[in-house]
Amino acid sequence: MARLVGVDLPREKRLEIALTYIFGVGRTRAKETLAATGVSPDLRVRDLSDDDLVALRDHIEGNYRVEGDLRREVAADIRRKVEIGTYQGLRHRRGLPVRGQRTKTNARTRKGPKRTVAGKKKAGRK
């Protein structure tokens, strides 16, 4: 298995797809990296030479924040918003959607499983 910036790339996948296993590298950055290093995107990871791996590693580490550095930066940004008391920080603290999504229905991913409130019944019609 080839390792780049601390991530094992799947051997059987095309390089263009395998690079997206790195946190911070999506399809666009993978294509940019392959174009800049001159490595074929159709190459399988198992067929990579050591020179290609070194070129990819140097380009990714030199030009992008990925994996641990990026995760720390995102966590620090969220922590800063919580500390200075912005609306987004408040939403993060309460575990609610941050980017304006509705919460009357849905939002179960952020809110977690439903909690039944005792004594609350649906209003009946007279």
Swiss-Prot record:
Q: Per the UniProt entry, what are the Gene Ontology biological process annotations, in alphabetical order?
A: translation
- Per the record, which residues fall in region Disordered? 92-126
Q: Name one GO cellular component term.
A: cytosol
The record's keywords, sorted A to Z, are: Ribonucleoprotein, Ribosomal protein, RNA-binding, rRNA-binding, tRNA-binding
Family annotation (PROSITE patterns):
RIBOSOMAL_S13_1, RIBOSOMAL_S13_2
GO function terms (MF aspect): rRNA binding; structural constituent of ribosome; tRNA binding
Q: What does this protein do?
A: Located at the top of the head of the 30S subunit, it contacts several helices of the 16S rRNA. In the 70S ribosome it contacts the 23S rRNA (bridge B1a) and protein L5 of the 50S subunit (bridge B1b), connecting the 2 subunits; these bridges are implicated in subunit movement. Contacts the tRNAs in the A and P-sites.
Q: How does it assemble?
A: Part of the 30S ribosomal subunit. Forms a loose heterodimer with protein S19. Forms two bridges to the 50S subunit in the 70S ribosome.
**HAMAP family reported for this sequence:** Ribosomal_uS13
Name of protein: Small ribosomal subunit protein uS13
